[in-house]
Protein backbone atom coordinates (compact mmCIF):
# COMPACT_ATOMS: atom_id res chain seq x y z
CA UNK A 1 0.00 0.00 0.00
CA UNK A 2 1.26 3.48 -0.86
CA UNK A 3 2.07 5.80 1.99
CA UNK A 4 0.03 8.97 2.26
CA UNK A 5 1.46 11.61 -0.06
CA UNK A 6 2.87 14.54 1.88
CA UNK A 7 3.77 18.04 0.70
CA UNK A 8 6.53 19.03 3.13
CA UNK A 9 8.48 22.24 2.92
CA UNK A 10 11.80 21.59 1.23
CA UNK A 11 14.98 22.07 3.25
CA UNK A 12 17.49 24.60 2.00
CA UNK A 13 19.56 21.85 0.37
CA UNK A 14 17.30 19.54 -1.60
CA UNK A 15 18.25 15.88 -2.01
CA UNK A 16 16.83 14.63 -5.32
CA UNK A 17 16.61 11.14 -6.81
CA UNK A 18 16.35 10.82 -10.61
CA UNK A 19 15.06 7.90 -12.66
CA UNK A 20 14.96 8.15 -16.47
CA UNK A 21 13.63 5.92 -19.25
CA UNK A 22 13.32 5.94 -23.02
CA UNK A 23 15.32 7.77 -25.64
CA UNK A 24 18.76 9.33 -25.38
CA UNK A 25 17.14 12.76 -25.22
CA UNK A 26 15.30 11.81 -22.03
CA UNK A 27 18.56 10.76 -20.42
CA UNK A 28 20.22 13.95 -21.63
CA UNK A 29 17.49 16.13 -20.15
CA UNK A 30 17.65 14.20 -16.88
CA UNK A 31 21.36 15.00 -16.71
CA UNK A 32 20.72 18.66 -17.47
CA UNK A 33 18.21 18.83 -14.62
CA UNK A 34 20.74 17.21 -12.30
CA UNK A 35 23.37 19.72 -13.38
CA UNK A 36 20.96 22.61 -12.82
CA UNK A 37 20.31 21.45 -9.27
CA UNK A 38 23.85 20.44 -8.33
CA UNK A 39 25.27 23.72 -9.66
CA UNK A 40 23.10 25.45 -7.06
CA UNK A 41 24.38 23.33 -4.21
CA UNK A 42 21.69 20.66 -4.12
CA UNK A 43 22.40 16.94 -3.84
CA UNK A 44 21.66 14.18 -6.35
CA UNK A 45 21.24 10.93 -4.41
CA UNK A 46 21.29 7.30 -5.61
CA UNK A 47 18.02 6.06 -4.11
CA UNK A 48 14.52 7.38 -3.36
CA UNK A 49 14.92 6.41 0.28
CA UNK A 50 17.69 9.00 0.64
CA UNK A 51 15.83 11.74 -1.25
CA UNK A 52 13.59 14.61 -0.26
CA UNK A 53 11.88 14.26 -3.64
CA UNK A 54 12.04 12.02 -6.72
CA UNK A 55 11.98 12.93 -10.41
CA UNK A 56 10.71 10.32 -12.87
CA UNK A 57 11.57 11.11 -16.51
CA UNK A 58 8.99 9.12 -18.45
CA UNK A 59 8.69 7.49 -21.86
CA UNK A 60 5.41 6.45 -23.46
CA UNK A 61 6.40 5.36 -26.96
CA UNK A 62 4.55 2.01 -26.69
CA UNK A 63 1.93 0.63 -24.33
CA UNK A 64 4.36 -1.75 -22.59
CA UNK A 65 6.55 1.22 -21.65
CA UNK A 66 3.52 3.18 -20.46
CA UNK A 67 2.54 0.37 -18.09
CA UNK A 68 6.06 0.30 -16.69
CA UNK A 69 5.96 4.05 -16.11
CA UNK A 70 2.66 3.83 -14.24
CA UNK A 71 4.11 1.12 -12.01
CA UNK A 72 7.17 3.26 -11.25
CA UNK A 73 4.91 6.21 -10.40
CA UNK A 74 3.07 4.08 -7.83
CA UNK A 75 6.33 2.82 -6.33
CA UNK A 76 7.96 6.25 -6.06
CA UNK A 77 4.79 7.90 -4.75
CA UNK A 78 4.70 5.11 -2.17
CA UNK A 79 7.79 6.63 -0.58
CA UNK A 80 5.49 9.33 0.80
CA UNK A 81 7.66 12.10 -0.61
CA UNK A 82 6.99 14.65 -3.36
CA UNK A 83 7.19 13.23 -6.87
CA UNK A 84 7.88 15.10 -10.09
CA UNK A 85 6.76 13.33 -13.27
CA UNK A 86 8.78 14.68 -16.20
CA UNK A 87 9.29 13.50 -19.76
CA UNK A 88 6.72 12.69 -22.41
CA UNK A 89 3.87 11.45 -20.20
CA UNK A 90 3.84 14.80 -18.41
CA UNK A 91 2.82 16.42 -21.70
CA UNK A 92 1.01 13.77 -23.72
CA UNK A 93 -0.90 12.01 -20.92
CA UNK A 94 -1.38 14.58 -18.19
CA UNK A 95 -4.80 13.32 -17.13
CA UNK A 96 -3.58 9.74 -16.84
CA UNK A 97 -0.64 10.84 -14.69
CA UNK A 98 -2.90 12.91 -12.44
CA UNK A 99 -5.27 9.98 -11.97
CA UNK A 100 -2.38 7.67 -11.18
CA UNK A 101 -0.48 9.92 -8.76
CA UNK A 102 -2.79 12.83 -7.87
CA UNK A 103 -0.19 14.65 -5.79
CA UNK A 104 2.59 14.57 -8.37
CA UNK A 105 3.93 17.68 -10.04
CA UNK A 106 4.16 17.59 -13.84
CA UNK A 107 7.15 18.87 -15.80
CA UNK A 108 6.70 18.57 -19.60
CA UNK A 109 9.80 18.14 -21.79
CA UNK A 110 10.00 21.75 -22.93
CA UNK A 111 9.87 22.95 -19.34
CA UNK A 112 12.76 20.96 -17.90
CA UNK A 113 14.75 24.12 -16.92
CA UNK A 114 11.95 24.88 -14.46
CA UNK A 115 13.02 21.97 -12.24
CA UNK A 116 14.89 24.37 -9.97
CA UNK A 117 11.87 26.60 -9.50
CA UNK A 118 9.51 23.64 -9.19
CA UNK A 119 11.44 22.27 -6.23
CA UNK A 120 11.68 25.65 -4.55
CA UNK A 121 15.43 25.48 -5.00
CA UNK A 122 16.06 28.67 -6.98
CA UNK A 123 14.93 30.44 -10.12
CA UNK A 124 14.51 28.75 -13.51
CA UNK A 125 16.35 30.29 -16.46
CA UNK A 126 13.92 29.77 -19.30
CA UNK A 127 13.12 27.23 -21.98
CA UNK A 128 16.25 27.23 -24.10
CA UNK A 129 19.69 25.73 -23.80
CA UNK A 130 21.16 26.98 -20.52
CA UNK A 131 24.81 27.55 -19.74
CA UNK A 132 25.41 25.92 -16.35
CA UNK A 133 28.30 24.85 -14.20
CA UNK A 134 28.42 21.07 -14.58
CA UNK A 135 29.76 18.25 -12.48
CA UNK A 136 30.92 15.90 -15.23
CA UNK A 137 32.66 13.39 -13.01
CA UNK A 138 29.69 11.02 -12.75
CA UNK A 139 29.42 10.48 -16.52
CA UNK A 140 31.81 8.89 -18.98
CA UNK A 141 29.98 10.28 -22.00
CA UNK A 142 28.13 13.49 -22.82
CA UNK A 143 24.53 13.66 -24.00
CA UNK A 144 23.73 17.01 -25.62
CA UNK A 145 20.13 17.69 -26.72
CA UNK A 146 20.15 19.97 -29.77
CA UNK A 147 16.42 20.52 -30.27
CA UNK A 148 12.92 19.71 -29.11
CA UNK A 149 10.25 18.23 -31.35
CA UNK A 150 10.20 17.09 -34.96
CA UNK A 151 9.03 18.13 -38.42
CA UNK A 152 6.93 15.04 -39.10
CA UNK A 153 3.28 14.17 -38.64
CA UNK A 154 3.46 10.40 -38.26
CA UNK A 155 0.08 8.82 -37.61
CA UNK A 156 1.36 6.40 -34.95
CA UNK A 157 3.55 8.68 -32.86
CA UNK A 158 2.59 10.00 -29.43
CA UNK A 159 6.01 11.60 -28.90
CA UNK A 160 5.11 14.46 -31.21
CA UNK A 161 2.13 15.22 -28.96
CA UNK A 162 4.57 15.48 -26.07
CA UNK A 163 7.37 17.42 -27.72
CA UNK A 164 5.67 19.38 -30.49
CA UNK A 165 7.23 21.00 -33.51
CA UNK A 166 10.92 21.64 -34.02
CA UNK A 167 12.50 24.11 -31.62
CA UNK A 168 16.28 24.22 -32.03
CA UNK A 169 18.72 25.31 -29.37
CA UNK A 170 21.23 28.02 -30.41
CA UNK A 171 24.45 26.85 -32.05
CA UNK A 172 26.58 28.86 -29.63
CA UNK A 173 24.90 27.32 -26.58
CA UNK A 174 25.43 23.80 -27.92
CA UNK A 175 29.05 24.52 -28.79
CA UNK A 176 29.67 25.95 -25.32
CA UNK A 177 28.16 22.87 -23.71
CA UNK A 178 30.22 20.47 -25.83
CA UNK A 179 33.36 22.49 -25.16
CA UNK A 180 32.71 22.18 -21.42
CA UNK A 181 32.51 18.41 -21.71
CA UNK A 182 35.65 18.22 -23.84
CA UNK A 183 37.54 20.39 -21.35
CA UNK A 184 36.41 17.93 -18.66
CA UNK A 185 38.15 15.22 -20.74
CA UNK A 186 34.97 13.53 -21.93
CA UNK A 187 35.65 12.15 -25.40
CA UNK A 188 32.35 10.47 -26.34
CA UNK A 189 29.74 13.14 -27.16
CA UNK A 190 26.21 12.31 -28.31
CA UNK A 191 24.12 14.95 -30.11
CA UNK A 192 20.49 14.00 -29.66
CA UNK A 193 16.97 15.01 -30.64
CA UNK A 194 13.77 13.47 -31.99
CA UNK A 195 15.11 14.17 -35.48
CA UNK A 196 18.60 15.62 -35.62
CA UNK A 197 18.35 16.36 -39.36
CA UNK A 198 15.51 18.79 -38.57
CA UNK A 199 17.91 20.86 -36.49
CA UNK A 200 17.87 24.53 -37.45
CA UNK A 201 14.96 24.41 -39.88
CA UNK A 202 13.10 26.73 -37.51
CA UNK A 203 15.91 29.26 -37.29
CA UNK A 204 17.94 29.55 -40.47
CA UNK A 205 20.71 27.09 -39.66
CA UNK A 206 21.20 23.35 -40.19
CA UNK A 207 22.66 20.15 -38.79
CA UNK A 208 25.71 20.34 -41.10
CA UNK A 209 26.41 23.88 -39.87
CA UNK A 210 26.14 22.69 -36.27
CA UNK A 211 28.48 19.76 -36.92
CA UNK A 212 31.08 22.06 -38.43
CA UNK A 213 30.85 24.35 -35.40
CA UNK A 214 31.13 21.49 -32.91
CA UNK A 215 33.98 19.72 -34.70
CA UNK A 216 35.82 23.04 -34.72
CA UNK A 217 36.32 22.70 -30.96
CA UNK A 218 39.93 21.88 -30.11
CA UNK A 219 40.49 18.46 -28.59
CA UNK A 220 40.47 14.72 -29.15
CA UNK A 221 36.84 13.61 -29.04
CA UNK A 222 34.16 11.95 -31.14
CA UNK A 223 30.62 13.06 -31.98
CA UNK A 224 27.80 10.57 -32.42
CA UNK A 225 24.93 12.10 -34.37
CA UNK A 226 21.55 10.83 -33.18
CA UNK A 227 18.53 9.60 -35.08
CA UNK A 228 17.42 11.48 -38.18
CA UNK A 229 14.43 11.00 -40.48
CA UNK A 230 14.77 10.45 -44.25
CA UNK A 231 12.22 13.26 -44.70
CA UNK A 232 14.61 15.87 -43.30
CA UNK A 233 17.92 14.22 -44.16
CA UNK A 234 17.31 14.05 -47.92
CA UNK A 235 17.19 17.84 -48.60
CA UNK A 236 20.54 18.35 -46.84
CA UNK A 237 22.16 15.11 -47.98
CA UNK A 238 25.24 16.42 -49.80
CA UNK A 239 26.01 19.04 -47.14
CA UNK A 240 25.47 16.48 -44.38
CA UNK A 241 27.84 13.97 -45.96
CA UNK A 242 30.44 16.73 -46.29
CA UNK A 243 30.08 17.61 -42.58
CA UNK A 244 30.40 13.94 -41.63
CA UNK A 245 33.84 13.88 -43.26
CA UNK A 246 35.39 15.36 -40.11
CA UNK A 247 37.45 12.72 -38.27
CA UNK A 248 35.68 13.86 -35.10
CA UNK A 249 32.32 12.51 -36.33
CA UNK A 250 31.64 8.82 -35.83
CA UNK A 251 30.74 7.24 -39.15
CA UNK A 252 27.36 6.13 -37.84
CA UNK A 253 23.92 6.80 -39.30
CA UNK A 254 20.66 6.07 -37.48
CA UNK A 255 18.01 6.42 -40.18
CA UNK A 256 14.63 4.82 -39.38
CA UNK A 257 12.83 3.51 -42.46
CA UNK A 258 9.86 2.00 -40.50
CA UNK A 259 8.61 -0.02 -43.50
CA UNK A 260 9.84 -1.28 -46.84
CA UNK A 261 6.42 -0.75 -48.41
CA UNK A 262 5.51 2.64 -49.89
CA UNK A 263 1.82 2.14 -49.15
CA UNK A 264 2.50 1.60 -45.46
CA UNK A 265 4.84 4.61 -45.40
CA UNK A 266 2.01 6.68 -46.87
CA UNK A 267 -0.41 5.42 -44.20
CA UNK A 268 2.18 6.30 -41.58
CA UNK A 269 2.55 9.78 -43.16
CA UNK A 270 6.29 9.39 -43.19
CA UNK A 271 6.41 11.62 -46.30
CA UNK A 272 9.19 9.82 -48.15
CA UNK A 273 9.46 6.71 -50.30
CA UNK A 274 11.61 3.62 -49.88
CA UNK A 275 13.74 4.87 -52.79
CA UNK A 276 14.54 8.04 -50.81
CA UNK A 277 15.80 5.95 -47.89
CA UNK A 278 17.99 3.91 -50.23
CA UNK A 279 19.35 7.05 -51.89
CA UNK A 280 20.49 8.41 -48.52
CA UNK A 281 22.19 5.13 -47.61
CA UNK A 282 23.89 4.97 -51.00
CA UNK A 283 25.24 8.50 -50.59
CA UNK A 284 26.70 7.83 -47.15
CA UNK A 285 28.14 4.47 -48.14
CA UNK A 286 29.78 5.92 -51.23
CA UNK A 287 31.52 8.51 -49.05
CA UNK A 288 32.20 6.24 -46.05
CA UNK A 289 32.28 2.58 -47.11
CA UNK A 290 32.56 1.28 -43.54
CA UNK A 291 29.83 3.45 -42.04
CA UNK A 292 27.58 1.68 -39.52
CA UNK A 293 23.92 1.87 -40.52
CA UNK A 294 21.13 1.52 -37.96
CA UNK A 295 17.46 1.60 -38.88
CA UNK A 296 14.08 1.06 -37.21
CA UNK A 297 11.14 -0.99 -38.48
CA UNK A 298 7.56 -1.16 -37.19
CA UNK A 299 5.87 -4.47 -37.99
CA UNK A 300 2.13 -5.03 -37.84
CA UNK A 301 1.13 -1.47 -38.74
CA UNK A 302 -2.58 -1.28 -39.69
CA UNK A 303 -3.03 -2.44 -43.26
CA UNK A 304 0.29 -4.30 -43.43
CA UNK A 305 -0.40 -7.33 -45.62
CA UNK A 306 1.87 -10.32 -46.13
CA UNK A 307 3.04 -8.73 -49.38
CA UNK A 308 3.77 -5.41 -47.68
CA UNK A 309 5.79 -7.16 -44.99
CA UNK A 310 7.62 -9.16 -47.65
CA UNK A 311 8.75 -5.88 -49.18
CA UNK A 312 10.21 -4.88 -45.81
CA UNK A 313 12.09 -8.18 -45.65
CA UNK A 314 13.35 -7.61 -49.20
CA UNK A 315 14.54 -4.11 -48.31
CA UNK A 316 16.50 -5.31 -45.28
CA UNK A 317 18.09 -8.08 -47.36
CA UNK A 318 18.97 -5.55 -50.04
CA UNK A 319 20.49 -2.77 -47.93
CA UNK A 320 21.88 -4.97 -45.11
CA UNK A 321 21.84 -2.54 -42.18
CA UNK A 322 24.29 -3.25 -39.36
CA UNK A 323 21.46 -2.84 -36.85
CA UNK A 324 17.68 -3.07 -37.15
CA UNK A 325 15.50 -2.06 -34.20
CA UNK A 326 12.29 -4.05 -34.61
CA UNK A 327 9.10 -2.88 -32.86
CA UNK A 328 5.61 -4.33 -33.06
CA UNK A 329 2.99 -1.67 -33.73
CA UNK A 330 1.48 -0.30 -30.54
CA UNK A 331 -1.78 1.64 -30.82
CA UNK A 332 -1.39 4.86 -28.83
CA UNK A 333 -4.59 6.55 -27.75
CA UNK A 334 -5.19 9.83 -29.53
CA UNK A 335 -3.11 8.99 -32.59
CA UNK A 336 -4.77 8.42 -36.00
CA UNK A 337 -3.24 4.95 -36.38
CA UNK A 338 -5.00 3.72 -33.24
CA UNK A 339 -8.36 3.71 -35.03
CA UNK A 340 -7.26 2.82 -38.56
CA UNK A 341 -8.88 -0.08 -40.37
CA UNK A 342 -6.87 -3.24 -40.93
CA UNK A 343 -5.43 -3.67 -37.45
CA UNK A 344 -3.02 -6.63 -37.51
CA UNK A 345 -3.70 -9.35 -34.94
CA UNK A 346 -1.08 -9.75 -32.25
CA UNK A 347 0.10 -13.25 -33.15
CA UNK A 348 0.75 -12.23 -36.74
CA UNK A 349 2.70 -9.12 -35.73
CA UNK A 350 4.74 -11.24 -33.31
CA UNK A 351 5.54 -13.77 -36.03
CA UNK A 352 6.66 -11.00 -38.37
CA UNK A 353 8.81 -9.52 -35.62
CA UNK A 354 10.50 -12.86 -35.05
CA UNK A 355 11.10 -13.38 -38.75
CA UNK A 356 12.65 -9.95 -39.22
CA UNK A 357 14.72 -10.35 -36.06
CA UNK A 358 16.17 -13.63 -37.32
CA UNK A 359 17.17 -11.89 -40.54
CA UNK A 360 18.75 -8.90 -38.83
CA UNK A 361 20.78 -11.12 -36.49
CA UNK A 362 22.05 -13.18 -39.43
CA UNK A 363 23.08 -10.03 -41.31
CA UNK A 364 24.83 -8.63 -38.23
CA UNK A 365 26.78 -11.86 -37.71
CA UNK A 366 27.84 -11.89 -41.36
CA UNK A 367 28.95 -8.25 -41.27
CA UNK A 368 30.87 -8.69 -38.04
CA UNK A 369 32.53 -11.90 -39.22
CA UNK A 370 34.19 -9.77 -41.88
CA UNK A 371 36.06 -7.85 -39.18
CA UNK A 372 37.83 -10.90 -37.73
CA UNK A 373 41.58 -10.61 -38.18
CA UNK A 374 41.53 -6.86 -38.72
CA UNK A 375 43.38 -4.35 -36.53
CA UNK A 376 41.35 -1.35 -35.38
CA UNK A 377 41.79 1.72 -33.19
CA UNK A 378 39.27 1.68 -30.34
CA UNK A 379 38.19 4.54 -28.04
CA UNK A 380 37.44 3.12 -24.60
CA UNK A 381 33.99 4.32 -23.50
CA UNK A 382 32.79 2.32 -20.47
CA UNK A 383 33.58 -0.62 -18.22
CA UNK A 384 32.26 -3.95 -19.44
CA UNK A 385 31.34 -7.13 -17.61
CA UNK A 386 33.78 -9.44 -15.84
CA UNK A 387 36.80 -7.15 -16.02
CA UNK A 388 36.40 -6.15 -19.66
CA UNK A 389 36.22 -2.70 -21.24
CA UNK A 390 33.90 -1.53 -24.01
CA UNK A 391 35.03 0.79 -26.75
CA UNK A 392 34.04 2.20 -30.12
CA UNK A 393 35.76 2.27 -33.46
CA UNK A 394 35.56 5.29 -35.76
CA UNK A 395 32.56 3.62 -37.41
CA UNK A 396 30.92 3.20 -33.99
CA UNK A 397 31.34 -0.56 -33.83
CA UNK A 398 31.35 -1.71 -30.22
CA UNK A 399 34.46 -3.69 -29.30
CA UNK A 400 34.87 -5.73 -26.13
CA UNK A 401 38.44 -5.53 -24.84
CA UNK A 402 39.69 -8.30 -22.49
CA UNK A 403 41.00 -6.16 -19.63
CA UNK A 404 40.17 -3.12 -17.52
CA UNK A 405 41.41 -0.05 -19.38
CA UNK A 406 41.21 3.67 -18.57
CA UNK A 407 38.10 5.27 -20.05
CA UNK A 408 38.69 7.83 -22.77
CA UNK A 409 41.93 6.31 -24.06
CA UNK A 410 42.70 4.90 -27.49
CA UNK A 411 43.73 1.27 -27.78
CA UNK A 412 44.73 -0.84 -30.77
CA UNK A 413 42.96 -4.18 -30.99
CA UNK A 414 42.96 -7.20 -33.27
CA UNK A 415 39.42 -8.49 -33.78
CA UNK A 416 39.16 -12.17 -32.85
CA UNK A 417 35.39 -12.69 -32.90
CA UNK A 418 32.34 -11.11 -34.50
CA UNK A 419 29.04 -11.48 -32.65
CA UNK A 420 25.51 -10.23 -33.30
CA UNK A 421 25.87 -7.06 -31.24
CA UNK A 422 29.60 -6.42 -31.05
CA UNK A 423 33.16 -7.38 -31.85
CA UNK A 424 35.66 -9.02 -29.51
CA UNK A 425 39.22 -7.76 -29.64
CA UNK A 426 42.62 -8.53 -28.17
CA UNK A 427 45.06 -5.74 -27.39
CA UNK A 428 48.22 -5.46 -29.45
How should each PLM-predicted stretch be described?
Residues 1-199, 236, 253, 275-286, ...:
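Proteins enriched for Cys/Gly/acidic motifs involved in redox and nucleic-acid/cofactor modification
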Residues 6, 328, 339-428:
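Terminal RNA-binding accessory module
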Residues 65-67, 165-170, 200-205, 266-270, ...:
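Short, solvent-exposed loop/turn segments at secondary-structure boundaries
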Residues 83-84, 92-93, 97, 183-306:
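Conserved SAM/AdoMet-binding glycine-rich loop
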Residues 113, 152, 164, 197, ...:
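Glycine-centered loop/turn positions within well-structured domains
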Residues 137-140, 150-152, 259, 289-291, ...:
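Short flexible coil/turn linkers enriched for glycine and charged/polar residues
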Residues 174, 191, 225, 255, ...:
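Conserved, mostly hydrophobic/aromatic
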Residues 304, 318-321:
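Contiguous mid-protein beta-loop-alpha structural module that forms a pocket-lining wall or clamp
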Amino acid sequence: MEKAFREPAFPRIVKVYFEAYGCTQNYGEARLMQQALSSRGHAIVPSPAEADTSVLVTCTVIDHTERKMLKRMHVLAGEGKPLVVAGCMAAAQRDLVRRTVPGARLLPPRKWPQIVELLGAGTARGDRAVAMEADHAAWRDAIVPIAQGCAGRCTYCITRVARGRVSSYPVDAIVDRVRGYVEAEIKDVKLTGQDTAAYGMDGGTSLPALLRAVTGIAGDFRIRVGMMDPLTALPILDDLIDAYASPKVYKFLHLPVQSGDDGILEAMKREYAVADFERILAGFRAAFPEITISTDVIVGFPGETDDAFARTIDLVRRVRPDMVNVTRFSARAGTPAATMAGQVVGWRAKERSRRLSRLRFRIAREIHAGYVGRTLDVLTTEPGKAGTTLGRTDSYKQVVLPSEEPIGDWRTARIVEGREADLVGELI
